[in-house]
Regions:
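Short acidic/histidine-rich active-site segments
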Residues: 114-118, 160-181, 187, 235
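Short glycine/serine- and small hydrophobic-enriched flexible loop segments
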Residues: 81, 198-202
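Histidine/acidic residue-rich metal-binding segments in metalloenzymes
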Residues: 2-164
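A short glycine-threonine-serine/GTX helix/turn-capping micro-motif
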Residues: 66-70, 181-186
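Short, catalytically relevant binding-site loops at active-site mouths
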Residues: 98-99, 121-122, 169-173, 217-221
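Mid-to-C-terminal alpha-helical segments outside catalytic/metal-binding sites
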Residues: 199, 206-228
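Conserved small/polar residues in nucleotide/adenosyl-binding loops
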Residues: 231-238
């Protein structure tokens, strides 16, 4: 079950407590949750509308302050709390902040009921990239501070983060025009994800084994497609040898 606890592209928000309780208590399926607190985001938008009163849009550089660290943490903390109470299997999508990492465990993947992923964008970019790339790196959750990026990289290596994902969401360049409110959120990532991670391997950020584990083996285990994934890998290795 993919659960949008924060609004993103499309109208799929589920943030009413009764609905959330029904989902967490009513399924033994994996719940994959996009976590951003809608009330916090709404209040931040109003604050920036007042700051830029009369402007056609809010600068895209304000996007990480609108979809802020508190917005991400509040929603992720709620999801983890509900999962623990219900005994549900939970996978937090697109973790983008250092603060959220305290919600997760670095124990072996096989022992976890609650897992987490980081996206390629949050492992590559920081606030400073808005100056050169603008809305092209606008995504939900937002790309945030360098300290968040470095914490996420460390968490991938330590086991707090179990998966590296793409959150592939391509748009026309014309749809990426505008600022924090008008430009569409999302980036094309499938075609760049492996190349980008291999560049980080070359830089010494990750080992090749870690990239394979986080982009292939762990997702296969978490989503229950392990037999197919490993069969294909073994077949490829046999042919290569």
């Amino acid at each position: 079950i993919k659960l949008f606890m924060g609004s993103s592209t499309g109208n799929m928000l589920v943030d009413k407590m009764n609905s959330l309780l029904n989902i967490f208590n009513g399924t033994d399926m994996l719940i994959a949750a996009h976590c951003e607190d809608q009330e916090t985001i709404k209040n931040n938008i109003e604050k920036y509308k007042q700051k830029y009163k009369g402007a056609d849009d809010i600068p895209v550089s304000a996007h990480p302050s609108i979809r802020s660290v508190p917005a991400c943490y509040a929603s992720s903390e709620l999801a983890v709390r509900l999962a623990k109470i219900a005994g549900a299997r939970l996978h937090i999508l697109h973790v983008s902040t250092a603060k959220e990492l305290q919600l997760f465990s670095d124990e072996p993947l096989a022992n976890k009921n609650i897992t987490a992923e980081a996206c390629v964008a949050h492992l590559l970019f920081t606030l400073t990239h808005y100056n050169s790339l603008g809305a092209r790196i606008k995504c939900n959750p937002a790309v945030k501070r360098k300290t968040d990026r470095e914490a996420l990289r460390t968490a991938v290596n330590s086991g707090l983060i179990d998966v590296i994902a793409t959150d592939h969401a391509p748009h026309l360049l014309s749809e990426k025009e505008g600022g924090a409110l008008k430009a569409m959120s999302g980036m094309p990532m499938i075609q760049f994800s492996l190349v980008s991670m291999l560049e980080l391997v070359d830089e010494g950020v990750f080992s090749l084994e870690t990239v394979v584990q986080k982009m292939c083996h762990a997702p296969a285990r978490i989503y229950g497609i392990c037999p197919v994934s490993y069969t294909h890998l073994r077949a490829h290795e046999t042919r290569s040898n």
